[in-house]
Swiss-Prot record:
The gene is pheS. It comes from the Bacteria. This is Phenylalanine--tRNA ligase alpha subunit. It is found in: Cytoplasm. GO terms for cellular component: cytoplasm. Belongs to the class-II aminoacyl-tRNA synthetase family. Phe-tRNA synthetase alpha subunit type 1 subfamily. One of its GO terms (biological process) is phenylalanyl-tRNA aminoacylation. Mg(2+) binds at E256. Tetramer of two alpha and two beta subunits. Pfam families: Phe_tRNA-synt_N (PF02912), tRNA-synt_2d (PF01409). NCBIfam families: pheS. It catalyses: tRNA(Phe) + L-phenylalanine + ATP = L-phenylalanyl-tRNA(Phe) + AMP + diphosphate + H(+). Binds 2 magnesium ions per tetramer.
Length: 343
């Protein structure tokens, strides 16, 4: 039995040398020795005919032969596959000095560019950026902002209600009142931005979803002059230092007094056109009380900007729907720096 096993080892290595460069022949050799009815299986069957004293030695030799064949075949298969892969790579003649493909990259959306520009301005002035929920309770969306039950803004035709107590926020002021409560009567300077939702009929200038950015300052000795100076900073940042603005009285339930800000545009014929860009005002005393501020000690101002409206005026866009159409031909016009080359 031992002599037979030694001959089989020699036979295996001889066959291996002849077939080591052909993967299919290596698979045949594998099956010949290790298959269900292969040579090793037949050897194992012969063990039962051996005397008991020889079975142990013969069994060890068969197991050694099996492990030797498995290890050697696996090693040769891996070597052959690796050599085949290397040969294939060499045949492709890759030139590593060639420039890489110029993959297309996107750029910052024009609405986000406006938001980032405003945020950079207010960060330089010491403001904090805050974020909040798009699904809000009636309490934080309306009641905290001096809009009690029965107020027109709470009517079903103006808002997207989820249930009797929740809705899609109609402004980002929900972020402000939550931050006011969290500060527990201490001064704050924040801006917040995000999507808001109102039941408008979609057309060239209106959308049921749009972007809004709001600012809020609460401190001692805050007055209308501070608000006006802040509004001038915004318009200069967005439209240039020479841009003239016009303030006119308005009404918002959460500010008193309230104003709307118009850009003053001088036409070629010398006449002036007024384009509304934002609303603002001094924080209503009741809103301060709702958030545990003493209106006798603290005052504040707030402003809200419709980002799409700013972008439409700044870039002379005629249809608000262009911002959401995902048309590369439109968006590439606003790509900054070298990004424009990647479209």
């Amino acid at each position: 039995m031992q002599t037979k096993i030694k001959k089989l080892i020699a036979q295996f290595h001889t066959s291996l040398q002849k077939n080591k460069y052909d993967l299919d022949k290596l698979m045949i050799l594998d099956k010949e020795f290790l298959g269900k009815k292969g040579i090793l299986f037949e050897l194992t069957q012969e063990l039962k005919n051996l005397p008991h004293a020889q079975k142990s030695v013969a069994g060890k030799l068969i197991n050694f032969l099996k492990q030797e064949i498995i290890f050697t075949l696996q090693k040769e298969k891996e070597t052959l596959k690796r050599n085949q892969l290397n040969a294939k790579i060499l045949q492709e003649e890759i030139d590593p000095t060639l420039p890489a493909f110029n993959f297309c990259q996107g750029s910052t959306h024009p609405l986000n560019q406006i938001i980032e520009k405003i945020e950079d301005l207010f960060l330089s002035l010491g403001y904090e950026i805050k974020e909040g929920n798009e699904i809000e309770t009636l309490f934080y969306n309306f009641e905290m902002l001096n809009m009690g039950k029965g107020h027109p803004a709470r009517e079903m035709q103006d808002s997207f209600y989820i249930d009797s107590q929740k809705l899609l926020r109609t402004h980002t002021s929900n972020i402000q009142v939550k931050e006011m409560k969290a500060r527990q009567g201490k001064p704050l300077k924040i801006i917040s931005s995000g999507k808001v939702y109102r039941k408008d009929d979609d057309d060239a200038t209106h959308s049921h979803q749009f972007m809004q950015l709001e600012g809020l300052v609460i401190d001692k000795n805050i007055n209308f002059s501070v608000l006006k100076e802040t509004l001038l900073l915004i318009t200069k940042e967005l439209f240039g230092n020479s841009q003239e603005i016009h303030l006119r009285p308005s009404y918002f339930p959460f500010t008193e007094p309230s104003i709307e800000v118009d850009l003053v545009i001088t036409k070629k014929d010398g006449t002036k056109e007024y384009l509304e860009i934002l609303g603002a005002g001094l924080v209503h005393p009741q809103v301060l009380k709702n958030a545990n501020y003493d209106p006798e000690k603290y005052q504040g101002f707030a402003f809200g900007i419709g980002i799409e409206r700013i972008a439409m005026i700044k870039y002379q866009i005629e249809n608000i729907r262009y911002f959401y159409a995902n048309d590369i031909r439109f968006l590439k016009q606003f790509a900054r720096n070298a990004d424009n080359e990647n479209y």
